[in-house]
Amino acid sequence: MHTLIKGVLEEILEEEVIIEYPKDREHGHYATPIAFNLAKVFKKSPLVIAEELALKISTHKKTQGLFDSVVACKGYINFTLSLGFLERFTQKALELKEQFGSQIKSERSQKIFLEFVSANPTGPLHIGHARGAVFGDSLAKIARFLGHEVLCEYYVNDMGSQIRLLGLSVWLAYREHVLKESVTYPEVFYKGEYIIEIAKKANNDLEPSLFKENEETIIGVLSGYAKDLMLLEIKDNLDALGIHFDSYASEKEVFKHKDAVFERLEKANALYEKDSKIWLKSSLYQDESDRVLVKEDKSYTYLTGDVIYHDKKFKQDYTKYINIWGADHHGYIARVKASLEFLGYDSNKLEVLLAQMVRLLKDNEPYKMSKRAGNFILIKDVVDDVGRDALRFIFLSKRLDTHLEFDVNTLKKQDSSNPIYYIHYANSRIHTMLEKSPFSKEEVLQTPLKNLNAEEKYLLFSALSLPKAIESSFEEYGLQKMCEYAKTLASEFHRFYNAGKILDTPKTKELLKICLMVSLSLTNAFKLLGIEIKTKISAKD
């Protein structure tokens, strides 16, 4: 609808037209500030230009039946859509059902490689991982809905010092809790009940002869064993959030291509040796300084794995590569992009979205840390506490790059302070009315819309505006727009519901048709957020 209106106006005015929503709904459905943009060109007041353009638009043959009014107001041009136009769009939307707001694959469609979560398999997923996980999953859903091809991948850091430290931590826990030895732990190690659980499980699963081998052999085996268990648990944690990946990329496998990548970097004159280390000349591409790839002891830095992995990704020739990283990784963006340029790729095809910190409260106090994981709040604990859908909604309700703080008890309230409950409640009210109505759904669907007042028309317009919300949320990576859209639409519906009778009036079928449109838009919006909307609210909800 938004795209159609924009296209018609641009054809009439032969200028690029920005379409906005007026701040005051009494000013209409859409507005454009084009007169301000043309004021310098025509050397006239925006107020005069707006009046002239409003007349031109309202009298043009292409707008007949499209608008009820085209009005110049303080330099803006405000548009009120006709009921006939809204009805045609409503009929089409209700026929499309769950595909309303979607787009078919076209030449504008992109091929997107989306990497997210990629947490080290050294422990269970905590709440900090959940935000990027939920965002990435919903972004993929929206992209596919808009006709794009998306591959979702999890990069598994299954080698290096952290995996060895995991094995060492399990070995020390084994000695302390299974062999009952007195153990001195290093300053840095993985702690928490999950490490003890792995140690005890290893005692049952692995051959007793293993524990008679030399310590490095034992640590090596336990590293792989613990890593595999953690990866299984991570997949279970993701499943609890409704998240599934298309593929998991192993760092160990990726590193098999190390020599070929280093050879190409050397040919590109991207490397040099200094202080017994091998450096990447990343400062040539806007990095603050050059970066070490190979340390003095010939071991590899974390960046090296990223460089090789991104080479693997870019060989697959996607239109766009999106990484979702924690905000603490912001310093890695320039260095990874530099490596891509040296390897002959267009680094502008890589977009890195940063997920800011999450702070959970319960009764206005910090949420209790998990004993099992040490100093972390586990995803599983919060999902068990408030439910998957509520957690997904709250994580998506703020921009990814802003800090998020919320009290989980808000998500248990049954009133308007709990946004997800209020949206479910709107849909539940609609389905309850449909059940009570003497009219079948087919009768309602076939009813023409003829007698709607301004408030009813505006509610219908809001429900029909879902496609624009979907498109904007994807283009701006602002998935909070979907949450805001659903909250606003639900609020408008509740206002409409409370304003007067819907059933047992001469307009019942027309009003129920509006309700069906509202329900469809709420359902489709929630589906893209990975949430199943409720048709009935029970006491336990």
UniProtKB/Swiss-Prot annotation:
Principal place of residence: cytoplasm
Gene3D superfamilies according to UniProt: Arginyl tRNA synthetase N-terminal domain, HUPs, Isoleucyl-tRNA Synthetase, Domain 1
Subcellular location: Cytoplasm
Enzyme class: ligase
Catalytic activity entry: tRNA(Arg) + L-arginine + ATP = L-arginyl-tRNA(Arg) + AMP + diphosphate
Transmembrane segments: none
Keywords in alphabetical order: Aminoacyl-tRNA synthetase, ATP-binding, Cytoplasm, Ligase, Nucleotide-binding, Protein biosynthesis
Domain of life of the organism encoding this protein: Bacteria
A Pfam family it matches: Arg_tRNA_synt_N
Family, as annotated: Belongs to the class-I aminoacyl-tRNA synthetase family.
Subunit structure: Monomer.
Protein name: Arginine--tRNA ligase
Taxon lineage: Bacteria, Pseudomonadati, Campylobacterota, Epsilonproteobacteria, Campylobacterales
Gene from which the chain derives: argS
